[in-house]
Amino acid sequence: KRQSVQGSSHRPRLAVFKSLKFVYAQVIDDLQGVTLVQANSGEPEILKKLEGGSKSKAAARMVGEALGERAKAKGIDAVVFDRGGYIFHGRVKEVAEGARSKGLDF
């Protein structure tokens, strides 16, 4: 059971996960338990644009931007940011800034 950050259908949760190779982000409605939108740095359209690696800060920013665009297309304007226990720095911060740059409010 989630204790700290809880999303709803009006304001879903934007969760970030970092692996050793990729950065993942998804928007989740915790009341229904479904993922509404997702993006990761392993997607071909993101990998094509990258010059660093799939785990770089530039990749994380592109993941945030892609997620922001997809969320806006689905009518999601505001989210609750769940940094997943990571400090708000580096790749996690870049995902947040990328999503904010596309108009997502949190």
Residues of each region from the PLM?
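Ribosome large-subunit tunnel/peptidyl-transferase-proximal elements
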Residues: K1-F106
